[in-house]
A protein has these predicted regions:
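Helix-start/capping segments and mature chain N-termini
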Residues: 1-144
Length: 144
């Protein structure tokens, strides 16, 4: 985790220096998480979601890049009746989270195994799997 927020979160940027530095500190990390003051906003090139007490928690739109895949996942979750809470998940909530995942156009919906040294209790848990299924179904329906 990096204790900073992207300066202009609504703009897709190629300024990856802070994320590069963060990944150098943890060679096993696939992405760096932006965590200003302990609030998880997004990762270096993906949107971030955490499942806490059965609710999907993700940063409010005004704090992050509102990517296409992020919008799709939020819409699919709400259409399926899943609770989506628009607030920044906290680093302090990681130990009690059930799942976490990142999204992106290429990554689609990718489970998170750990945040820093803290392991996520369920890697590719039921909510992540359900959203992956809903997304695959939406693509299949579109192609028919």
């Amino acid at each position: 985790p990096i204790d900073m927020e992207r300066p202009f979160p609504h703009i897709k940027s190629i300024f990856y220096l802070p994320a590069y530095i963060g990944r150098r500190q943890d060679k096993e990390a696939m992405e760096a998480l932006y965590c200003p003051a302990g609030e998880i906003t997004e990762s270096s090139s993906s949107s971030f979601f955490m499942v806490i007490d059965g609710k999907i928690v993700t940063a409010p739109t005004e704090r992050v890049l509102d990517g296409v895949m992020r919008q799709i996942v939020i819409k699919l979750a709400r259409e399926a009746g899943l609770a989506v809470e628009m607030r920044c998940p906290l680093l302090s909530e990681v130990p009690r989270s059930q799942e976490a995942f990142i999204t992106g156009s290429i990554k689609e919906i990718l489970p998170v195994r750990r945040i820093g040294s803290q392991r996520i209790s369920q890697v590719n848990g039921p909510i992540s799997q359900y959203l992956q299924h809903l997304y695959a179904q939406r693509i299949e329906d579109y192609l028919e």
